[in-house]
Amino acid sequence: MTLKKDQLTRAALNLNLSLIFFAAIFFHPASALTKIYAGNTLPTFTDFVKQVQNGEANVLRGVYVSDVLALPITQQPTGNPNYVSDNNGEATQFSTASQYGNIGLLAHNTLSGRSFSQLAEGQEVRLVYGDGEVESFLVTQVLRFQALQPKSAWSRFRNMRGGEILSTGEMFERVYSGRRHVTFQTCIRAYGNWNWGRLFVLAMPVPTYTLD
């Protein structure tokens, strides 16, 4: 009985997290649609680190990908996992992903999320913390899914490569569970619908080696 209860509790938790996960991008203010992303010349990585660091250790402050993006990172307010910044030139750290030991970075596809579509396998992703510490990752997967019911947080999703269909909960597990990694998330606009699909870009830690 205890095992079954634990399984049901975990299933309910995963479902709640899944709903939060999709609401974070789907229910964004209409005003965000009027702010079109305008990329500027990116700063050097050294200059970017100086701009975002504030002395706070273990607080994620920025993400940098050469020739693609240089975004300060804002944190979600406590108790508000649906929050996504409406400021152009920013990404938002997804607090729910942190509960899984992973890093989720959210942005509206009308703002900084546009740059997420320029990410490709093999690119280096550098995370900058408040104390200047840098953590490096490599992009390993770019996943694109069509939302079969774009206006519903309960939508099922079709993989645009292969046609696999996933539930909301299965999608959450696919992109946010597992060993430590970074997931970029934004919506895909198609056929005049800003929420037609979802884009996820996954990056794994760069292996480190020591000499004996």
Description of each model-found segment:
Residues 7-28:
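Sec-dependent N-terminal signal peptides of Gram-positive bacterial secreted proteins and lipoproteins
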Residues 31-212:
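Solvent-exposed, non-transmembrane regions of membrane-associated and secreted proteins
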Residues 2-6:
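Bacterial Sec-dependent N-terminal signal peptides
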